[in-house]
């Protein structure tokens, strides 16, 4: 009944009906070997078990719901919200309101940098990296109109959908036979247009049902834009032409001719009858879509204009363009001249995007994988002010001989290679970037009191192993610095937990016993005010 595999007193003997399980030896001398063998097996099984992993989730429903309740109660004036409520303590993360609550519409002191609440919406925190199993260069990304998913178009001609809250994969489909270069949702969110390297433009319904295909250009389609009422759309391509199409029948109506090289980007003004285009001939041109005539040509760039975009909100009278001469220029449509020049001393710029909520926030991306954020409030006059005249003594408008401004925040190692796409979430609380490193990366607003923020790999370029899975990736996304010097005055007794019983903010000026006072580490007292009215946000310059 037993079969012995060696002469060691039935050690390693097994029962034919025991499914291979080793029986405990009867000889006491073999007990030690048996126990050691069993422990070795258990250790091997334990090492094979998957470690518990935490997935980051961005739930905008909480702060959006709180804000709507406050609006219904008439508490919409949040001009002092950042100073009075958001404090440098990690538990205050849930008190961050939607981006709209910090916009100029609800901030009475927008022109005062000390109370500029737009800094709270700078996307400085790396959240997640998404990539397909079979990786390809990503040329463009778009958030779906409702903001629940991110649509990624790759060089393989595939559409990939990623969840916008949990960032997990949802579906993939073959959309084009050649690399997809551009996508655009209609203003009324009913249609999606995509263009590929063969010059084909495809119509898509929200459920990704392809209903029409047109051959738009002889070469690749570089950009697509809808008219304000969605009755027409434009395309530009490598054949140096800009074409206006009737959306309903897919017929070409006009061709805008004037560029002498590939047209890299084009946009249709959201309110005005105005089209802008940027080309490889270093020129930015403004067009009248009705007459197909060029109304103005903007000079100043010394290399290819990669991207040009109208200001989508606010006064909607500004134009941002980036070029391979390492500069981004902000043009005023009333004077047809550049008001500001943003320069990157390290590499050429590839993308530019306006924040969907904050009209004065601009984000640029570069070929070295860096991302820079700019706030233009202090440099641009209000809509009721006159157009500034150039003066060498007017430093507030940056119209001096240098005519440049610095980034208020920069992520130097956001990607490993060139960035091809920068897209804001419709609510403004998330930013997605993608590029030649074949990944799509998500960025969110900074966490209050995150001492390890500067030690993320996107700031230190520490890429040991799977670096993007270990970037400050604990449950609360906030870690204490192990090398930080502890302040005895900030230490709280074990029986005086500020997060217990009476709430998570009881430690300010009070203690559990009701007599002695204590303070939560990193939490300012209510009577203490910042020196300059600003709070520590990773990568943010002080005002």
Swiss-Prot record:
One Pfam family, short name: WD40
Entries under SUPFAM superfamilies matching the protein: WD40 repeat-like
Low complexity biased stretches: 1-12
Keyword Nucleus among record annotations: yes
Location of the protein in the cell: Nucleus
Annotated spans, Disordered: 1-31, 486-543
GO cellular component, one term: chromatin
Superkingdom, taxonomy of origin: Eukaryota
UniProt WD repeat ranges: 133-172, 175-215, 216-255, 258-297, 300-341, 344-384, 414-453
Keywords: Chromosome partition, mRNA processing, Nucleus, Repeat, WD repeat
InterPro entries: Pfs2-like, WD40/YVTN_repeat-like_dom_sf, WD40_repeat_dom_sf, WD40_rpt
Keyword Nucleus annotated: yes
UniProt-listed GO biological process terms: chromosome segregation; co-transcriptional mRNA 3'-end processing, cleavage and polyadenylation pathway
Record-annotated membrane-spanning stretches: none
Function: Required for 3'-end cleavage and polyadenylation of pre-mRNAs. Also involved in chromosome segregation where it has a role in chromosome attachment to the mitotic spindle.
Name used for this protein in its record: Polyadenylation factor subunit 2
